[in-house]
Amino acid sequence: MAKKSKQARAREFNEKSRKEIYYRDCGGCIFCAKGYRMEKATWLDKEILSVMHYIPRSKNGLGIPQNGALGCQYHHNMLDNGNEGVRGEMLEIFKEYLKSCYKDWNEEELVYSKWKF
């Protein structure tokens, strides 16, 4: 198996970050906690949880707690695919949530840069 680049590793959530996010988010989806658009979600959709990127990996979003939150399969899919035209609204909720967790939260610090020191 080929070794991942420094950039690829920086964009993934490591075990420590995943645990920090899990405990910060009380083990549940941040959108479910708000009751956001739950009408089509099945019980299984809500049971399967994963860490979502605020700034996606495809846009060099870092795998750090300040760029992630716990999401159920239903909401994670809705956020990633924007299939209901609510991606912008969800990103605003996500952003406000992260800002409430980190007083010095700065969106510019969530993107991988080879030249940051």
List the model feature ranges, each with a label.
Residues 1-26, 33-48, 88-117:
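A boundary/linker detector
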Residues 31-70, 84-87:
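Histidine-centered nuclease catalytic patch
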Residues 71-75:
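Zinc-coordinating Cys/His ligand positions in small cysteine/histidine-rich zinc-finger domains
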Residues 76, 84-91:
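Inner-leaflet juxtamembrane helices
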Residues 80:
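Active-site hotspot residues in diverse enzymes, especially metal/ion-binding acidic/histidine motifs
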